[in-house]
Amino acid sequence: MGRIYLALAGAVLFLSCQSASGQICKPVAERTGEVGCWIIASQPVGQLANAETFWHLDVYATRAEAEAARAPGSVVVESLGKTWLLTIADQGWRLSGGERIAEIGPLPIIAGQTYSAQYMEAIFTPGMVAPTHTHAGPEAWYTLAGETCLETPQGKQIGRAGGPPVIVPGGPPMHLTATGTEQRRALVLILHDSSKHATTPEHDWVPKGLCKI
């Protein structure tokens, strides 16, 4: 609980693994099983005045309570056994009611740019990977279980449940691998330029394999 700073990396819109090569992230309405990457909400955030912002995660007992507490920049989702109110807002922002789970950031953005938030539920078994891709804005995840290794041109970073998440700004290519021995379960945010796709495949950069398991 409480604040979590410096938390950005790997939403998995181009998943593959040995048993399911080339699987992409799909709308949750098309879900056919638990494992995979599922788009659970897309929310226009609007023009953001500052060069950084934060992702606030609160849990409510019921969807009705969460809906009643919604603010501009908020969306209610039911994911991973909980009812979440997810909000893009300044550092220290709070609503009444609910349980504050995390404040993730700062997320580096372009002041004055118009953004949209795409939220996903990611459930990976160890060994699943996300082929190389980029994002049109910062990406963040909140990990409830498991471990993930993210490789970028700057090296590798490890995100674990209970540890500090990883931040990657928009732009650089990345390659993600679910590592460890436990199923990875996470909520994922891509805060992207509203005029661009959230995720784009990257073919010019080849990872070094720093996250091999």
Predicted feature locations:
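Short acidic-glycine-tyrosine-enriched beta hairpin
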Residues: 28-29, 59-64, 124, 152-173
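Extracytoplasmic
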Residues: 114-119, 184
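Ligand-binding loop in jelly-roll beta-barrel domains
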Residues: 52, 79-83, 149, 169-197
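Glycine- and acidic-residue-biased ligand/ion/polar-headgroup-sensing regions
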Residues: 30-31, 136-154
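A short beta-loop-beta micro-motif enriched in histidine and acidic residues
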Residues: 112-116, 125-142
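A short, N-terminal "cap"/entry segment at the start of jelly-roll beta-barrel domains
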Residues: 20-114, 202-213
